[in-house]
């Protein structure tokens, strides 16, 4: 089983979008039994909060539910548990270092680095552009799944 953890600052916008987009892609490919997919935050600010409403609505526009998801903070144990820890941006990578250290097993990457457009996933918290974030997340998750097949 391949275990993937998507990570952003608060775990209420980008990383849960990636979690549920990837779950949807995996299900549509008939591969659900081969994957465990989750998401987490680097900060404590949003722990216990549901997915931010505009992010939830963007997923729903595409027939994807994130019902029941609440934010949680990543832990050092996540590094041992997951095969891939996928950050949404460079700030997330820096903040993840306190949990994962030097990444000796090379499990950590940026989602967009799996595409032909490396870099950060657009942060809708600052831009308000959930469509741009959707496009980045969909492109990143599609490319990651292709890599892992």
Descriptions of predicted regions:
Residues 84, 90-149:
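Phosphate-binding/catalytic loops
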Residues 1-81, 146-149:
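Conserved active-site segments centered on acidic
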């Amino acid at each position: 089983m391949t275990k993937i953890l998507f990570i952003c600052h608060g775990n209420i916008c980008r990383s849960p979008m990636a979690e549920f987009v990837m779950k949807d892609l995996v299900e549509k490919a008939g591969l659900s039994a081969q994957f465990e997919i989750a998401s987490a935050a680097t900060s404590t600010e949003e722990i216990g909060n549901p997915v931010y409403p505009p992010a939830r609505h963007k997923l729903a526009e595409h027939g994807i539910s994130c019902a029941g998801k609440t934010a949680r903070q990543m832990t050092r144990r996540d590094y041992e548990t997951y095969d891939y820890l996928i950050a949404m941006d460079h700030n997330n990578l820096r903040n993840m270092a306190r949990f994962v250290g030097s990444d000796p097993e090379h499990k950590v990457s940026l989602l967009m680095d799996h595409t032909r457009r490396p870099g950060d996933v657009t942060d809708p918290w600052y831009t308000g552009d959930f469509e741009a974030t959707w496009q980045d997340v969909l492109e990143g998750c599609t490319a990651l799944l292709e890599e892992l097949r």
